[in-house]
């Protein structure tokens, strides 16, 4: 696919134009009032609690749009849904039906009762928590590893291991379009306006397509190595990418320039999540902590200690609560104890 190349992101300091580092990048002079306020909050709410969810490692966690439920997808071929009751997660149901690992899941953007799972069994399944049943199974051409729901709720995009992205009508459950890419496709996402579709790829690029036309708009050389994950901030101002170079880069949605880099992790960045107000960014990797940064300055706001690599993080859509899931613990005796747990950070220390 011939897409015009933009200039390099984090390593192109001083350049301007789409895809470059903004020249106004500056180092913060001290903690902002927001950072100090959130640090004060987390000093009293720094507890992390574990909740049994699955019989094998958890690949994906996501909150419903109203924040009442958390869903998790696992290597054990199931999805679990929890209700958030005050300061704990109560398991509501386990969803069976997939014949292989559930690699990613997401909720409908505005209907808190529907979520969709992507599996290595070459299907996606749409589930309704009201009936606890699968309302649709859609067969796809390959083993599915990435999935997202369009902001208008009308389309589900699913990416497979063969770098094919299929666009599925959320009402008819039929394929509307299919794109085969000539590069390794990692995470996929619409922008908040629903008129562009973003892909991160194995060459360190962000590929941007118009939507629904799926015509190439731009390719940004975002990182010198594999660009793994992408998330849009709920305010629509920024998006962030995480890379195998251990950097998180923050991009201006309108200008497509890199405005900031976060470099406290040492391992490839696997997962990202913006807080509900767009002011905090959580990023995680094989490092044994989750970095929580203030978006506007890049300053470290907090770090959540982990005992193993983190696969997935998700901020609650209304509260400063962070759900996450880690790899199984190392060691013969510890590994089975933590396999399949979902964790929640931000709980009161005395809870």
From Swiss-Prot:
InterPro entries: G-protein_beta_WD-40_rep, Tex1/THOC3, WD40/YVTN_repeat-like_dom_sf, WD40_repeat_dom_sf, WD40_rpt. CDD domains: WD40. GO terms for molecular function: RNA binding. One of its GO terms (cellular component) is nuclear speck. Keywords: Acetylation, mRNA processing, mRNA splicing, mRNA transport, Nucleus, Repeat, RNA-binding, Transport, WD repeat. One of its GO terms (biological process) is RNA splicing. Pfam families: Beta-prop_THOC3 (PF25174). SMART domains: WD40. The modification N-acetylalanine is found at residue 2. The keyword Repeat applies. WD repeats lie at residues 53-94, 97-137, 139-178, 180-221, 222-261, 264-303. It comes from the Eukaryota. Residues 1-22 are annotated as: Disordered. The keyword Magnesium does not apply. Its main location: nucleus. PANTHER family: THO COMPLEX SUBUNIT 3, THO COMPLEX SUBUNIT 3 THO3. Component of the THO subcomplex, which is composed of THOC1, THOC2, THOC3, THOC5, THOC6 and THOC7. The THO subcomplex interacts with DDX39B to form the THO-DDX39B complex which multimerizes into a 28-subunit tetrameric assembly. Component of the transcription/export (TREX) complex at least composed of ALYREF/THOC4, DDX39B, SARNP/CIP29, CHTOP and the THO subcomplex; in the complex interacts with THOC2. TREX seems to have a dynamic structure involving ATP-dependent remodeling. This is THO complex subunit 3.
